């Protein structure tokens, strides 16, 4: 049974003193041995973390006791291994970056649609279905007949709307994303632009996969996630994709057989895009990763003090073994 609980959470809420939450939240996560990243901003909280069930329960209880963070939206999935290396709490201008001033999901937002009602909505021929995620996410899975805006970042989404959608022509627009947070902003943006009937999938793709049976599902492929699992299947288990550590693109086993694929250095997606300087840096990073593995240490995101302590204990154990051997010879 998978013993690592992965928790994706967010909440749009006014947090005028969000900076003061960072240290106590980080301390709580470190004490509970929770890894992952949470973002704090004046507009709320967002992120994905992982730990034991008890640790995640403790985190959710802690957040529920903070003014404004009660009843936070979260989705759980499971993994056999810890999908994160670090524990981080970052202070940001936005908890999901669209880059458009004045968009506030607390004031105006699209109509939430439950996973159980989603199929009926997107099967309506009058509904335009738009995937708000980035192109590399869409490539490995999306809903049947969904439009791919082919964006590299969420900042590009407003330009896509301006160039391709018209409130006079597109009367009904439905949108979706991984966990729901990008749709909060995208639907708020469309409402501000004059679109009247705007819908979004409540809880995002992850909630849909959790609640809708696979035989009834209109989801095709796997769902990209922002952790070391890379993607999850319809059962929310780790999927078939790996990830290029150079460009972060999801890659298949077939792509890993390509001459362009060098572990940690390049893949077919980025071989022609990285500079010689980047390549040298990636080669050195991979060397450090392999060196850390040979010492049975985690490289990326390891707590330096933990690594030093592990080395000290190893040396001390070797010293004691040597002393015992010398004593036996006497």
UniProtKB/Swiss-Prot annotation:
Keywords: Oxidoreductase, tRNA processing. SMART domains: RHOD. Residues 123-217 form the Rhodanese domain. It catalyses: uridine(34) in tRNA + AH2 + O2 = 5-hydroxyuridine(34) in tRNA + A + H2O. NCBIfam families: PRK00142.1-4. Belongs to the TrhO family. This is tRNA uridine(34) hydroxylase. It comes from Shewanella sp. (strain MR-4). The lineage of its organism: Bacteria, Pseudomonadati, Pseudomonadota, Gammaproteobacteria, Alteromonadales. The gene is trhO.
């Amino acid at each position: 049974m998978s013993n690592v609980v992965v928790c994706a959470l967010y909440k749009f809420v006014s947090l005028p003193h969000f900076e003061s939450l960072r240290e106590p939240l980080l301390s709580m996560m470190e004490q509970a041995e929770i890894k992952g990243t949470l973002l704090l901003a004046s507009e709320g909280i967002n992120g994905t973390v992982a730990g034991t069930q008890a640790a995640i329960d403790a985190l959710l209880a802690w957040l529920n006791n903070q003014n404004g963070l009660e009843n936070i939206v979260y989705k759980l999935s499971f993994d056999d291994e810890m999908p994160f290396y670090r524990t981080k709490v970052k202070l940001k201008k936005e908890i999901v970056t669209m880059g458009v001033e004045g968009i506030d999901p607390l004031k105006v937002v699209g109509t939430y649609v439950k996973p159980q009602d989603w199929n009926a909505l997107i099967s309506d021929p009058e509904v335009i279905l738009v995937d708000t995620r980035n192109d590399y996410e869409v490539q490995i899975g999306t809903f049947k007949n969904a439009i791919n805006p082919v964006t590299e970042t969420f900042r590009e989404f407003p330009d896509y709307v301006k160039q391709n959608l018209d409130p006079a022509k597109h009367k009904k627009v439905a949108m979706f994303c991984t966990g729901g947070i990008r749709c909060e902003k995208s639907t708020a943006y469309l409402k501000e632009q004059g679109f009247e009937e705007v819908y979004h999938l409540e809880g995002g793709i992850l909630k849909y996969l959790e609640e809708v049976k696979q035989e009834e599902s209109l989801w095709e492929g796997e769902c990209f996630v922002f952790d070391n699992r890379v993607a999850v299947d319809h059962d929310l288990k780790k999927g078939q994709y790996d990830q290029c550590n150079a460009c972060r693109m999801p890659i298949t086993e077939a792509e890993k057989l390509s001459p362009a694929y060098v572990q940690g250095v390049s893949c077919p997606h980025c071989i022609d895009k990285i500079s010689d300087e980047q390549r040298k840096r990636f080669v050195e990073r991979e060397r450090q990763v392999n060196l850390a593995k040979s010492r049975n240490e985690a490289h990326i995101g390891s707590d330096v003090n933990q690594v030093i302590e592990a080395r000290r204990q190893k040396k001390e154990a070797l010293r004691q073994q040597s002393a015992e051997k010398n004593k036996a010879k006497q």
